[in-house]
Amino acid sequence: MSNQRPISAFIEKNYLHFNSAALVDAAKAYKKHIAEGKKMLVSLAGAMSTAELGISFAEMIRQNKVHIISCTGANLEEDIMNLVAHSHYKRIPNYRDLTPEQEWDLLQNHLNRVTDTCIPEEEAFRRLQKHLFKVWKDAEDNGERLFPHEFMFRMINSGDLKQYYEIDPKNSWMIAAAEKNMPMVVPGWEDSTMGNIFASYCITGELKASTMKSGIEYMVWLADWYTKNSGKDGIGFFQIGGGIAGDFPICVVPMLHQDLERDTIPFWSYFCQISDSTTSYGSYSGAVPNEKITWGKLNIDTPKFIVESDATIVAPLMFAYILDL
């Protein structure tokens, strides 16, 4: 086994068939895509930030293995929550055995459960809230309108959160993204804790809804970014999980082709999805990649991969392989 890249050597020796082989094929194709000078979008769904994907994903960002990110509002905020409140999280290995009464007790103790991990409301949500409100309010007072991730970047780059850091900041993918001013889209941001908090300030009249740029504006921005960055060969699409984080950005290509009639725009030029959503009737998240050809998202010869497994296991391994670890 190679001493220089022990994880990669282990993967190459042992991952030879079935889902494990699909992992290797997809990771090799990812490396080839980047080596050819093409760019890659990574989408994050589910609770990947709470799963601490930042430990491996932040290094992917620093080493320019990802060029644009699409994520849910939950992933946008939960990486920062883990950064500032890590020691207050509570793990419950036997979560399957919890009674409704025990779940209620967690709520009364301000612990919000995600599978086996409870996020502490006071230390995570409220700690961020006061700093984020200031960023929102200052922007509004200055007549600025920003995207959700831009407000987060501004809060991170201000340094105001450093007093709370409870993990090594190199393990936060949001810090890595903020340092690079990473291109991002956060579709459906309203469906998040900070989205709900922002709405509450709009209800009380302390903020205006128009201060936050919308999902439509994200798509308009993405159309411009894709057009300027796709070249002749297109952008790659690496999808972790399903849902809006993947569905929203992948639609920019058929929109450019069909609605704007820009026929020269290239298709997505690599596609991989890691998902435990099994192929089923009527499921977008569980659809096989070839179905996307019929929607004008992928071309016939786009390299296509699907790893039907738990992304919390698969994604860090693939990132390690791509990083030659």
Feature-to-residue mapping (PLM):
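A glycine- and small-aliphatic-rich helix-loop capping segment at beta-alpha/alpha-beta transitions
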Residues: 56-66, 83-94, 202, 253-262, ...
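C-terminal functional extensions of proteins
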Residues: 7, 18-21, 244, 251, ...
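N-terminal glycine-rich anion-binding loop in soluble enzyme alpha/beta folds
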Residues: 1-27, 31-34
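A generic, well-ordered mixed alpha/beta core segment in the N-terminal half of proteins
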Residues: 61-128
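Glycine-rich phosphate/diphosphate-binding loops that line cofactor/substrate pockets in enzymes
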Residues: 26-40, 176-180, 224-234
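Short acidic, glycine/serine/threonine-rich loops at helix termini
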Residues: 52-55, 80-86, 196-200, 249-253, ...
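Ligand-binding beta-strand-loop-alpha-helix segment within the catalytic cores
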Residues: 102-193
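Glycine-rich anion-binding loop/nest that anchors nucleotide
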Residues: 40-49, 69, 185-189, 207-284
